[in-house]
Amino acid sequence: MLKDKPPIQSSLEFVSIDELVPKDHLLRKIDKVIDFNFIHDLVKDLYCADNGRPALDPTLLFKLLFIGYLYGVRSERQLIREVQVNVAYRWFLGLGLTDKVPDASTLSQNRRRRFNDSDVYQQIFDEIVLQAMRKRLVSGKVLYTDSTHLKANANKNKWVKGEAQSSSRDYLKALEEAVEEDRAQHGKKPLAPRSKEPQAREIKQSTTDPDSGYMVRDGKPKGFFYLDHRSVDGRCNIITDVHVTSGNVHDSVPYLSRLDRQRERFNFEVKAVGLDAGYFTAGICKGLEERDVYGVISYRRPTHKKGFFYKREYRYDNDRDLYLCPVDQALNYKTTDRQGYRHYQSNPRHCLTCEFKERCTSNAKGIKTVTRHVWEDSKERINQHRLSEPGKLIYKRRKETVERSFADAKQLHGYRHARFKGLEKVRAQCLMTAAAQNMKKIALLAA
């Protein structure tokens, strides 16, 4: 006989909140292996010690934020509603079943006023990495770096023309010295001093989020984005660096400085790195060789005008410092420009009567120009690494490390969109997401 079940919402029971949380719950594992006590000492200088109302425990506050990043809860109001009804969340925060959950405005005001414009988020991220190192989950020997885009909270059609300073490479000073040395060796006059004022370029600037950048890349959506330049350690896929820029900054611009930052902050002895084709620049190749790092960088076929010879068909003669065209005519050195490129030009008397002129140059005067960077030798040596057996093994792991890290962040941690407006706030989001991913990885491996 079918009977109606009596309501039990008003019944009283004696229960232990610890018994209600499954033994294999992720938050149990995180609580077991991650020490959160450092947060209190880290932020105590941001609080008044002897005045004002009692503050919300900062450790509880950041653990609350971590729950949101671990489970991809984008809204702080929704996060508070989830904590109110989720026993595991309450247990992780040290709250009883009847304890009052902090108000959403308390959470947001602390984030906006107390911790904004501070390095608290960076220090928290660094400490989680250090805890992973103490558990031998990070080697610092092989690093994988890439970038991914986060859609800015901005309408791509709401913009005005603006100006931005050209991004300066980490190796600009070294390049200037190399150019002057190369020109001197070829008997050329020194170039006029570079303007101290960085060159401005015209950009699309969002009226909603001016810090974001309008991104235009092959195979990528167009619009206003931020870029997360992330490095992952090859041992257990622990994220070791997060650097956020606007979406119109090239991947190669901050790379060397971020590599140096990891070596200094965590005392990494980096032996090898795996990078995609966006990092295959002469400056990065030279920088890796100077740091004695085995660089494995993907190759991207250069753009080629249909019907013309490929650049590889022009052979460089190092002994004579000239190029030979497909019919063995010499292209001699002419100059070295400020960007570090040597220019080699053909003799128009040979080109104008050559049967392959139409496949060689469209120059009206019959002059073919081929450029070669002053650090091209470094590029050629680094390029050979990807063809070696160790290089193939290193590059093969990119999809298992940094690419998997981004996929996990986008699929499970709400990483497709920027939650906030402004570079500093988006940087905080990226650091907290990466720290949450690291905590999960540590918990699954070490618990």
Stretch-by-stretch model annotation:
Residues 16, 60-66, 106, 127:
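A general alpha-helix detector
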Residues 38, 69-72, 87-91:
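Short alpha-helix boundary/capping elements
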Residues 1-28:
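Hydrophobic alpha-helical membrane-insertion signals
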Residues 3-4, 72-85, 95-447:
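Anion-binding and metal-coordination hotspots
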Residues 16, 34-38, 94, 161, ...:
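Short, solvent-exposed coil/turn linker segments
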Residues 23-66, 378:
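Basic, short loop/linker segments at the boundary and entry of helix-turn-helix/winged-helix-like folds
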Residues 59-74, 79:
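N-terminal catalytic cores of NTP/NDP-binding nucleotidyl/phosphoryl-transfer enzymes
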